[in-house]
């Protein structure tokens, strides 16, 4: 899980979602998981 000020899609499988007020990226590739923080 990467914590970044600005999250963006890295590949075409990445999905930008909101969970509990946080913007997150979920993907089939675990290296692409990100959270805004």
Swiss-Prot record:
GO cellular component terms, semicolon-separated: cytoplasm; ribonucleoprotein complex; ribosome
Any one GO MF annotation of this record: structural constituent of ribosome
Keyword check for Translocase: no
Claim: Ribonucleoprotein is one of the keywords in the record: yes
Any one biological process term the GO annotation gives: translation
Key words, A-Z: Ribonucleoprotein, Ribosomal protein
Listed InterPro entries: Ribosomal_bL36 (IPR000473), Ribosomal_bL36_sp (IPR035977)
HAMAP family: Ribosomal_bL36
Record-stated family: Belongs to the bacterial ribosomal protein bL36 family.
Name recorded for this polypeptide: Large ribosomal subunit protein bL36
Protein's organism: Cyanothece sp. (strain PCC 7425 / ATCC 29141)
